[in-house]
Amino acid sequence: MRKGRHYRYGYKKHVLTDGQGLVESIITTPANCADTVVLPELIEKAELTQGISVLADKGYCSKKNSACLLERGLIDGVMLKAQKGMKLTERQRELNNAISKMRCFIEPTFGSIRRWFSGGRCRYRGLERTHTQNILEAMAYNLKRMPGLLVLQSIK
C-alpha cells in the first residue's frame, strides 16, 4: 500500500515450491499474521506425498508445525530458531547451515517473479484482490519456466 511517497507492507505471500522452483501452492495473509500459523494450510493445499522434505526459514519454526509435518509423514526441514536466553547448539547450527544451502533452488522463484512481473508491490487493495494478483504471478512464472524445464528433461 502507498501512503504519501512511502510504500507500506500490508500483505505476506507464503509460497510452496517444488524442487525445480515451480510454485505449487500460495497463500496471501495480512502482514500481521504469524508465519507459523500458515504452514499446515500451505502443505494441505499442495497435497504433498509422504517422504518429501519440507524446507522453510526460521519464521515457520514451531513445535506445532514440526508435529504437523511428522503426522503427515513429511521430513522436517524447517530451520531452527534459538529460544530466548539460549543459543543454538553446534549441531543445530550445522543443520540450519545445511538447510540454508538448499535455498538456492527456492529463492530464484521470488526474485524472478519480482523481476519479470513487478511482483514486489500490490497493485490492488484488499486481501482477495492481492491474493488473485499473487496467483496470477505464480501461474505466469510457472508458464514461463515450463518450456525450459521440458527441454532439460528431454535432454536427460
What is each residue range found by the language model?
Residues 31, 80-84:
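Short, acidic/turn-prone active-site loops that include or flank metal/cofactor-
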Residues 37, 85-92:
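Short, charged, surface-exposed secondary-structure boundary motifs
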Residues 50-54, 77-78, 148-152:
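Acidic/polar loop patches that form or flank catalytic/metal-binding clefts of enzymes
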